[in-house]
């Protein structure tokens, strides 16, 4: 659709019907809006944050999960809702058709993702796939698998053998950053699971990913989101 607009406008210019192609802009500037740029961290900050996690004796156990968040653009509620059956290693993709939430009454519920179609597939890089495989290998199987609205096999469980939720990860990110900033003079800006998502989107747009493909992977209803 976008390419058709470009071609059609170029024909109008050639025939002197219009003076300038209204679609002759950088798509990068459309996809990554101001809020995304503002919240995303730089590639250098991302690498430094991940390095610190990987080398820290306590926080290293969260490295694989946080690497995945930086390199898939998943919403944290979608990530928490992932089960073993959502990982397709053969086709190197992640099925995203639900998200896990915990209500103020501490009730665990499964909801549909924000994506209009209700389902999408997010590609896995070799590094992301390796992270998932390590997570599955290190996962301690509980005596009784927790079930939420008929779903089982959640990748991350808390000390009570219940699925981890967004709040868990937000606290982990907070503690990691606090420790980092207590050690290094150059402070790390706020980094949350949502910042990971924005950073992935920004990185992919800057790398030249097809706009419609990026829109699909992110689960956005509009390219400009």
Regions found by a protein language model. Name each.
Residues 16, 105-107, 161:
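Detector for glycine-centered tight turns/loop "hinges" at secondary-structure junctions
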Residues 1-8, 13:
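Single conserved hydrophobic/aromatic residue that forms the stacking wall/gate
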Residues 51-62, 122, 138-147, 151-154, ...:
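Short, basic (Lys/Arg/His-rich) helix/loop patches that form interaction surfaces
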Residues 18-76, 80-82, 90, 117-119, ...:
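Basic, Lys/Arg- and aromatic-enriched nucleic-acid-binding interface segment
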Residues 27-30, 45, 82-140, 147:
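Conserved tyrosine-mediated DNA breakage-rejoining catalytic core shared by Y-recombinases
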Residues 32, 40, 99-100, 218-225:
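Catalytic-site neighborhood detector that most strongly recognizes the C-terminal catalytic loop/helix
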Residues 81-87, 215-221:
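A short, basic/aromatic helix-end/turn motif that makes direct DNA contacts
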């Amino acid at each position: 659709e976008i390419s058709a607009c470009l071609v059609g406008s170029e024909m109008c210019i050639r025939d002197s019907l219009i003076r300038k192609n209204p679609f002759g802009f950088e798509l990068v500037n459309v996809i990554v809006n101001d809020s995304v740029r503002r919240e995303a961290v730089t590639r250098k900050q991302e690498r430094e944050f991940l390095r610190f996690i990987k080398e820290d004796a306590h926080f290293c156990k969260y490295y694989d999960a946080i690497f995945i968040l930086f390199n898939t653009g998943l919403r944290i509620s979608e990530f928490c809702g992932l089960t073993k059956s959502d990982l397709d290693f053969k086709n190197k993709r992640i099925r995203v058709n639900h998200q896990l939430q915990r209500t103020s009454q501490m009730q665990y519920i499964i909801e549909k993702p924000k994506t209009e179609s209700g389902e999408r597939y997010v590609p896995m890089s070799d590094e992301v796939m390796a992270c998932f495989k390590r997570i599955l290998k290190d996962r301690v199987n509980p005596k009784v698998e927790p079930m939420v609205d008929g779903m089982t096999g959640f990748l991350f469980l808390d000390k009570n053998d219940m699925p981890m939720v967004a709040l868990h990860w937000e606290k982990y990110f907070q503690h990691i950053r606090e420790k980092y900033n207590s050690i290094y003079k150059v402070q790390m800006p706020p980094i949350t699971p949502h910042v990971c998502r924005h950073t992935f989107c920004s990185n992919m747009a800057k790398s030249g990913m097809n706009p419609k493909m990026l829109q699909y992977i992110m689960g956005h209803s509009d390219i400009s989101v």
